[in-house]
Amino acid sequence: MKKVLIALDYNPTSKKVAETGFEMAKAMGAEVTLLHVTVHSFLYTSVYENMGDWQTDSKDTIAIRNTGSRNFLEKAKRHLGDNAVQIVVRDGDFAQKILETADEIKADCIVMGSHSQKWLENILVGSVTEEVLRKSTIPLFIVPTKKQ
């Protein structure tokens, strides 16, 4: 195993996912890439809000969101204490961007957490981990993060 992609979100359990994936990668002498995927804001708003006024995110909104994501990943990288860790921010569908990034960097394994997000998000986009598991052509290491 030469490259490991660790997909992180803003959930507090991401620390556990990052640490577990990093330890596994280092034990195998693999390079690590941390990934955060941002999504269009309309997925997080009420379906009834501005029903007829669908607008795409402005370039400024996307830039602000991406800066926040990059800062989040830089903080995770500092926590892991390895300057060789790469960081990647993508915008779009979670599962699709995770799979595309894994392909782009030629990852040998994807590391993700098993927690679910907000109930509305699960209805709208389904379980990201489940979708990546179904569509991935490389091993997926799932870190259980649900509280006992």
Predicted region positions:
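General small-molecule cofactor/ligand-binding pocket signal
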Residues: 35, 86-90, 141
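Short, flexible loop segments at boundaries between secondary-structure elements
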Residues: 138-146
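Glycine-rich, Arg-bearing micro-motifs that act as flexible, cationic patches
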Residues: 109-131
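Short, hinge-like loop/turn segments at secondary-structure boundaries
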Residues: 49-53, 104-106, 128-129
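Small/aliphatic-rich secondary-structure junction motif
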Residues: 2-55
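Structural beta-alpha unit
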Residues: 77-110, 147-148
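A short acidic, glycine-rich active-site loop
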Residues: 54-68
